[in-house]
Amino acid sequence: DIVLTQSPASLAVSLGQRATISCRASKSVSTSGYSYMHWYQQKPGQPPKLLIYLASNLESGVPARFSGSGSGTDFTLNIHPVEEEDAATYYCQHSRELPLTFGAGTKLELK
């Protein structure tokens, strides 16, 4: 199985600042020009919401302050500027092969 390691486990960011979340895969999730890494946001009592697919593509309806980058084994989610509604837990997930796996999550809090 591909193991996804997220860092940090939690972070506190002031309104208007940048939040950066990293995800490292135990082996490459990129092939044939695509990186099969995705980012989700989850708030308490709600299902995960897809933010970014294929490493850098913004899901429809997601604000442009969310962006994703990376390839191979190293990926990043950036949120800038952070808004109050962004307080949530963020997960990376790969779809390179079965089983699909998720990172352990990063909890974003506002200062």
Swiss-Prot record:
UniProt signal peptide: none
Spans annotated as Framework-1: 1-23
One BP term from GO: adaptive immune response
GO cellular component, one term: immunoglobulin complex
Keyword Disulfide bond: yes
Cystine connections: 23-92
Chain residue ranges for the region called Complementarity-determining-1: 24-38
Framework-4: region residues: 102-111
Record keywords: Adaptive immunity, Disulfide bond, Immunity, Immunoglobulin
Annotated source species: Mus musculus (Mouse)
Pfam families: V-set (PF07686)
Region described as Framework-2: 39-53
UniProt region (Complementarity-determining-2), positions on chain: 54-60
Listed name of the protein: Ig kappa chain V-III region PC 7175
Region (Framework-3), start-end ranges: 61-92
Region (Complementarity-determining-3): 93-101
